[in-house]
Structure formats: C-alpha cells, structure tokens
C-alpha cells in the first residue's frame, strides 16, 4: 500500500515560523549584562552546549568559558544479532580520546580533538568498502562486495582543532581544520585494503550587531581520498562458479555489475565537500539562543585507476544537503535548560559515464529534537531529565534494478541522571530508554537481471527492509565513579551497558531475521580537568 507522504515544503515553512516565534518568546529574557561563566562537564548533561562550542566557535568569542581538558581510554564490545546485513557480527574497539578548550591572556580561544581507535570486526560480509550499515539504512552505492564473511582489522586517526577571537569590537573570526587517516584491512579472500585521507578547513566570521546580538557566516571545504585495492591468495575463488567469493560491484541498490579491472595498481575514490551558511545568536547573562542554516554539496567520484584523471572516471554521486538548527540555553538559580532542534534534508543522484545515465537516487529527510532540564550544585548533578525525538522520511530508488524503497520512522527517548556524593568522591548513574517505531513504509522490486542479482535482493535488500520495519526497544545504563586528585584533576572510572531488543516485525515479506538481542558493553577511565 502506498503511503501518503508528508510534504517537506510545508515542514520547512512551519519550521521558519516556529523559529520566529521562539525568537520573539526568548527575546524578553535576554539582556546586555555580562554573561556568566560556562562550565562544561564531560557528561551527557553538557553534550548540547559542548557540541555548540566546538561546531560554531564564532558564537562564543566573547563568552566566558572555563578551560577544560578531557582524556579517555576505553574498550567497547558490540555483539550484533538484531542488525542489518552489512554489519559485523562482533566489533571490538580500543580507543584514546582527548578534547581541550583554552583561553589565553590575550583572549585567543584555542580548542581541539584527538581520536585514536583500533577496531576489530568479526564476520562481516556483503561489503568490501569502509561503509557500514550501522547508522545508515542503505550504504551509498559504488562499492565492491562478496557475500563471504570475514574479519577486518581497522585503524582510525582523527585530529581537529582551531581558534577563535574578537578582532575588533564588531568583527570576530573562527578557523577550524581537521585531518584524518584510516586503514581498513580484510583478512580473507577477497582481501581488500582501504586507505583514507581526509583534510578540511572551515572559516566563520561574525559581526556584533549590538552588545548581545551577533550575525555570522560560515564556509568550509574538505577533500577526502580513498585508495582501494584487493587481492586473492587463491585466484580461482574469483570465478563465477564460486558465488561466495566472486567479486561484484554494486552500482546502486540492486544494480549489480561484474567487477572490472583497474588500469593501474588499484582504485580511487575522491570526495569534494563544500559548505556555506549563515546564522544569528542572541545572548543574555544566563541565556543563549542561536539559529543557523547551511547548504552543503558533495561530489564523490569513483576512478577505475589509482590516478584521478578524467579518462579514469567511471561513477559519480552528487549530494545536495540543507541543514537548519535552533539552539537554546537558559539557567536560573541552580537549574538550566538546553534544547536543540534540527532539520536535515538531502538529495543524491549518481551518474555512470559508461552508460551515460543515472540509475540511483535517494531523498533523506530528518527532524530531531533534544531537550534537557537539570539542577546542579557546583559540580554535583542533583538531577537531569531529558528527551529526544527523531523523525525520518527516507526514499531510495534504483531504476535499473528495479528497487524502490520508502522508509518512515519515529524514534523517541527519555534519559535521566543523578550524582550520589560521598566525602570526596561521587557516583553518577545515567539511564536512557529509547523506542523505535516504524511508520507506514514501502518496498517494490522487479528483477531485471534474469536472476543473477536476486541473491543480493533476498539476503540484503529484503532482510534490511525487515530490520528497518521492526519495532525495537533500546535501554542503556551508565555508571561512573569520580575521585578528585591533585591540581583540580578528576579521575573517572565508567562502564556502559546498552541493548537493542526487537519487539515486533511490521513487514509482510516472508523473510526470517535474527531478532536476538544486540548489546554493547563499554568500560574505561577518564582524566578530566
């Protein structure tokens, strides 16, 4: 049955009206008084304000933010039972994370992040790229695959940082840069090896309209390059008589091609991403309100060589995205409230130079809202309650396979947290409960390959559709014990436990999926100051 689709243009129109109403509502509580110091904790209680400080530093050039440094070493085990097909059965992650924010005597604000990860995946099939269907409903096309499952050994290094400063009484600037490198290696035929290099930068310029109002613009550019190679220790396994290991290429979502030889020593993916946007913020002594919008373009090119020459171009996929965001923060007495409302919309379309046409498109729409109310006594959390909502309306279409999917869903959640203080130390308990509701969705498929592509449809497309249209419950519990040491440093020992429990399958397709509980366990130590 075809669903009645919500008109996105109406959502956009209503969102802008809502922004104007919120701005009018909050304007009465903003004054030109000096703003109180913002103290950020390494805890879910400050996730929203922390995210704003690092994403849009130009907004906070004249804010008093207490210096902080967070470091973490942790281990995470993820056992995937109820999950999409292109996800490893087991994932073990060892990671080191660091984050810092400092203000110099001359009022330069410096900030940065560092992440080092070792990721071991067990039993991953149907994809030879570095993309995974953990957060994505559908992996972007243009990747090699074999059905056979194998283990992966992966390394991730990511570094980002920047600065911000008021240049004059009216002009402020913020500059961010990021660099990352990744290596993914599969341990069985077909043995793929992937090396990623990411480099990007962003500039934000603000103009102080009045003492408590600022307008700003932002622009960014990033270039991501991915080298892909594969080899067989037993070359006979790359023959059509061995379907488990015979190399295929997914040119859409169901349009499957036989693999093609490289004209060099491997293959290359190049992704160019640019972004431009604008925003407005108003601040009071105890309040912040920010509204912003940006548009982003991505052009991802697949080359049948390791050289990025025009003659080697084979596939392209272009994505146009729009993002709108509202953030509000207010505190009074010992209480504070934070709220983030976001709207994301994107359209993607691929192009095959050899056939001189396209076959794959997607249209993704998302509205998310997170809000929290907390009471603090110095660094002690008396209580925290919050909620989050995520509505998604996504459409995927491959005109040559032929596959058409409409996925609609609502994810709702609540969370709470509290500190239990002792003489010097404290114990924090945080619990969250999320529920995923699939809304009326649709899957149409007609096999135009004469049966050669039917296995991908049966084992990936239908299977994932059944997972995406199954209700699930996701509870999480986090415990952390904090103990202060010398020089205002705090050592934190923590553990997380999260489960994903399938509740009810909605699809009528005759497919059997694994509904055993998926779970995550994480433990680690932090040094915060």
Task: Report each predicted region and the residues it spans.
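Transmembrane beta-barrel strands of outer-membrane/channel proteins
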Residues: 71-77, 112-118, 175-181, 217-223, ...
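Long, internal scaffold/assembly segments composed of regular secondary structure
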Residues: 249-391
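Outer-membrane beta-barrel translocator domains and adjoining extracellular loop/strand segments
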Residues: 81-88, 123-129, 184-192, 228-234, ...
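Outer-membrane beta-barrel transmembrane strands
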Residues: 87-95, 150-168, 174, 194, ...
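Outer-envelope beta-barrel architecture signal
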Residues: 65-71, 106-112, 169-173, 211-215, ...
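Residues on the lipid-exposed face of transmembrane beta-strands in outer-membrane beta-barrel proteins
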Residues: 98-102, 159-165, 201-207, 276-284, ...
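Outer-membrane beta-barrel "beta-signal"
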Residues: 37-38, 211, 516-529
């Amino acid at each position: 049955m075809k669903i009645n689709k919500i008109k996105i243009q109406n959502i956009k129109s209503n969102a802008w009206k809502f922004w104007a109403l919120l701005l009018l509502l909050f304007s009465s509580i903003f004054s030109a008084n000096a703003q109180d110091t913002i103290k950020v904790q390494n805890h879910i209680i400050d996730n929203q304000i922390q995210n704003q400080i690092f994403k849009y530093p130009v907004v906070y050039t004249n804010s008093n933010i207490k210096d902080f440094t967070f470091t973490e070493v942790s281990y995470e085990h993820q056992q995937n039972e109820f999950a999409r097909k292109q996800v490893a059965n087991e994932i073990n992650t060892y990671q080191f994370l660091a984050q810092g924010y400092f203000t110099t005597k001359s009022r330069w604000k410096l900030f940065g992040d560092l992440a080092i990860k070792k990721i071991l995946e067990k039993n991953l099939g149907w994809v030879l790229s570095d993309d995974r269907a953990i957060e994505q409903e559908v992996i972007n096309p243009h990747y090699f695959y074999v059905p056979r499952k194998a283990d992966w050994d992966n390394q991730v290094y990511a570094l980002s940082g920047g600065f911000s400063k008021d240049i004059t009484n009216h002009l402020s600037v913020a500059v961010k840069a990021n660099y990352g490198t990744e290596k993914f290696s599969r341990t069985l035929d077909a043995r793929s090896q992937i090396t990623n290099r990411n480099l990007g930068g962003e500039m934000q310029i603000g103009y102080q309209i009045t003492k408590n109002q600022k307008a700003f613009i932002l622009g960014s550019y990033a270039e991501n390059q991915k080298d892909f190679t594969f080899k067989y220790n037993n070359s006979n396994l790359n023959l059509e008589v061995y379907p488990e290991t015979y190399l295929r290429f997914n040119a859409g979502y169901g349009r499957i091609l036989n693999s093609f030889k490289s004209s060099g020593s491997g293959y290359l993916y190049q992704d160019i991403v640019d972004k431009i946007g604008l925003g407005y913020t108003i601040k009071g002594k105890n309040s912040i309100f920010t509204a912003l919008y940006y548009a982003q373009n991505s052009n991802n090119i697949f080359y049948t060589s390791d050289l990025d020459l025009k003659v080697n171009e084979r596939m392209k996929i272009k994505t146009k995205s729009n993002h709108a965001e509202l953030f509000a923060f207010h505190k009074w007495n010992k209480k504070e409230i934070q709220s983030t409302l976001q709207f994301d919309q994107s359209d993607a379309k691929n192009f095959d130079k050899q056939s001189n046409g396209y076959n794959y498109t997607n249209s993704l729409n998302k509205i998310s809202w997170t809000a929290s109310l907390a009471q603090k006594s110095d660094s002690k959390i008396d209580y925290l309650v919050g909620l989050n909502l995520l509505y998604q309306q996504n459409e995927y279409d491959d005109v040559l396979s032929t596959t058409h999917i409409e996925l609609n869903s609502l994810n709702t959640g609540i969370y709470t947290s509290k500190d239990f203080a002792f003489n010097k130390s404290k114990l924090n308990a945080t619990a969250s409960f999320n529920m995923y509701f699939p809304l009326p969705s649709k899957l149409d498929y007609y096999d135009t390959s004469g049966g050669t592509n039917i296995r991908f449809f049966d084992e990936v497309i239908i299977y994932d559709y059944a997972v995406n249209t199954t209700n699930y419950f996701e509870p999480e519990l986090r415990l952390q014990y904090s103990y202060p040491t010398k020089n205002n440093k705090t050592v934190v020992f923590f553990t997380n436990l999260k489960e994903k429990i399938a509740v009810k399958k909605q699809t009528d397709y005759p497919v059997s999926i694994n509904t055993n509980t998926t779970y995550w366990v994480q433990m680690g130590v932090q040094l915060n100051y």
